[in-house]
Structures are given as structure tokens and as C-alpha cells.
Amino acid sequence: MLSASVLTSAAILENNRFIYNSCSIEFLLLVYLLVRKARKKIRFIIGVVLSVLILAVLGTGSLYIYKTVSALDTITGVNKDVTKINVYVKEDDPAQKLADASGYTFGILSELDRDNTDQALQQMYYELGSDVQTNEYSGLSELADSLNNGTTGAIILNQAYLDVLDEMDNYSSFSSQLREIASLQVETVVQRKTPQVTEATGSTTETSDNSSADAAVTDEVYTIYVSGIDTRGEMTASSRSDVNIILTVNTRTKQILMISTPRDYFVPLSISNGVPDKLTHAGIYGVNVSMDTLNMLYDININYYFRLNFAGFEKIIDALGGITVNSDYEFDSQNTKGYHFNKGENHLNGEQALVFTRERYAFKEGDRQRGRDQMAVIQGVVDKATQPAFLKNYLSVMDSLDGCFETNVPYDIIASLVRRQLDEGGSWQVLSYSADGTGDTQKPYSMSQKAYVMIPDQTTVDKAKTLMKKVREGFMLSEADVAR
């Protein structure tokens, strides 16, 4: 998503290898002819200079290609989600490892995330060589209380739930009183719906499988989910998703529409049997649940996803030499003191951009405005990466990608799209729109008590549906179409 410029070398590697090698051979032949019978000093000097020049060019080109391919191999083609189910004891408990707690009674959630818990229990059985004694609890607060009052000696819990507990009244310090004695990983295959062109007109259908798409297919419309996490943990680990953006990408009209959905949107999850939850909590159960939940909300089929780590995203921005971001308001940051942002253009380094994307308390519209600012930062990165000056920062940007984002978009699809861009040229139009709602206090599916949520404004949801449909069908939108 960092633009075609970031991926240009990969496309050159696949599409222009012949030209690259042919030019190299011709250049070497020229050097040979100049030096072969170097009776004249000037001809010999020219030959030597050209030899040094071609070595430098070939070395630099090879380095650019290597860095690009290496980066793409790292971030593309991801097909699994990892859920970490951890075993926790109180900080002062004598148990240091799982075997030390073999005689304990373990607290577990009776329904929430039960499939992952059961798989973790099976792993514990194989490791301990005996059955695990458990007590079941209906909610997070009951589970936490069981450990605090000694009813259980340890608890088995998806680590992503610790952030949820931190949000709950009377449990904000609970996670700091725990010690992890075992970590069990449960892997889930990430499903994707691959667009397939059915006619020359570019109309598409979806197939739900994990096969690689034909690299020659470029006349497609992609619907891509961008999940933004704010953590320094592993990218593949399931966690709450604080950024939820849907990209509708029409490669024929060169138009990209970004739809932001607030993290606190109170909607049924695909696994909650109709019980509403905060959208951010969908990420606890894996990226499949986040995508399926948004599919239900907007009546769409998401093809692929990008998972973006905003805590590491600052590395990319610093590698780019900073970005220019348009702010709707002049404000001082509240979460992190000491940062001031002007209305209009702001040139930001990585740390400043991270503060900008995190801020919500400085705005009357809170999380709504934060979603718009997150899209503005993504737009700033795209704008900077498509400028010619980007090439001087290219290698440092490639080095910064690892650990910042991942995607299940296959390598060949990205290379195919880049080759088309190189062949046809032309600029892309990027527009954004945010779904809205009304603040309320409700009990979410994943929590044991009431919390702040946002009740969806169906009018804005319907408008988002219409906008995405128009982009998919090839209509060119204007700024007026996405105005709030």
C-alpha cells in the first residue's frame, strides 16, 4: 500500500530483466572494444572509467532489486493468524513454569474464545501428561476475581483480553499484577476471497479459497481491509484493531476509496450470535472475524487485508524523511504532551505522525476525527512515496518495512499491478469517507460490564455502501461525493 514506487524494482526484476541484461552486455562490449587495443591513452582511460561506472550501476541496481524482493517476501503472502493463549499466575505466586502449576485449578472463560482455549488445554495436556483441572467463568471480571480471591491458582486467557481488562472499571491494574508462566500458540488460516475477471469488461466474481491469483490479471476491483494495531508485539498475533479502514481499489479507473469505521462501533461480530460488541474487539478473535464483521456491516466481500503496526509505522515515515499531513484542526496533543499541530499542512516526523494518529481527546468528535487523521497519515505516506525524491530514501524505506505491516495479498498480484502502472502511467485519485454514530453506554459481547460504545448512524453506513459500490462499478467520485 506504500504505492507503486515502493515496488518498482520488483516489477523491473520480473518484467524488464531482459532489457537490464541486454544493456549490461552491450555496455561491457563497448568497454571491451575501447580497451582491447588501448594504443591511445585517452581511449584506455575512457574504457576504465566506463568499467567503473558499469560496476557501480550494476551493483546499485542489484542492491535495489535484492532489497525490494527481500522486503516483499517478508510482508506478502501471509496466510495465518496466531492467537496467544497464556497461562497467568499472581505476581507473587511461586510457580515459575507450567510444570510448577500442574496441581493448580485453572480458571477459563466458559464461552468467550472457547475454541482457542480448548486447543490450548489440549497442548497443556500433552505437555503435563495429565488432565488439567478447570473452573469456568462467564466473563472477564469473574475470571479475574477468581484469581484474586484464590478460587483458582492460575488463569488461561487470550493475551489480547488484557487490553480489554485494562479498559474495565476496577480492573485497570489487573494485568500489571500478573506473571506469565506459559504461552501457547493457536494458528488459524486466514481466508481470502480472490477476485476473478469474468469478462473483458473487467466484471468480477469472488471465490473463497487460498489459491494464488493469476499474475496476468489486472482488470480487477479489490476490496482490502486495513487493520491498524498499536502494539510492539508480533504482527501475526491477534489483538484489538484500533484502525479499521476498507480500501476499494479500482485498477481500471485508478481510484481508491478509503472508508473508516470507528473502533467503538457497536455491531454484531460474525461469531457473537447477534450480540453487539465494539468493532475493535473483533481483532481479538482474529483478522477473519474483523473482515467477516465488516462484510456483514457493509454487505461487501473483502478480498485481502493489510495489517499495519502504527507503533512501528514511524520507522517508515522517518525513512521517508517525514511526511506532510493536512489537519482539519489546530490542536495540542492530550495523550502525549508537548505536541502542537496547525490547521492545514504539517510536516511531521515519525514520532509526531504517531502522536497525530493516536490523538482523540483533543477533538469534540473524538474517535471519529482520529479515524480521519489516520487516513490523512496514510495519504501523506502515499504522497511522499510517489514523489521522484523518494528514490534517495528507497533503501532505508525497504529496511524499515519489516515488522511494520504484513498482508495476505500475493506477491504476483502486487507485481502485476505495479507492472501495469509502469506501462500505463497516470495518477491515482484517493478519496476518504468516515462512518459515524452516536455515543452510548452498553455492555459489549467481550466485556463483563458496560462501556462506551458508538451506535452506528445507518445513514452514514448506507452512504459508505453506495460509495463503495460506485467505485467498484467504475463511477468517478468527486470530493463533493464524500463530503461530510
Enumerate the predicted regions with their spans.
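Membrane-embedded alpha-helical segments of integral membrane proteins
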Residues: 1-35
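Juxtamembrane transmembrane-helix termini
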Residues: 36-40, 67-70
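Internal/C-terminal transmembrane anchor helices
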Residues: 43-64
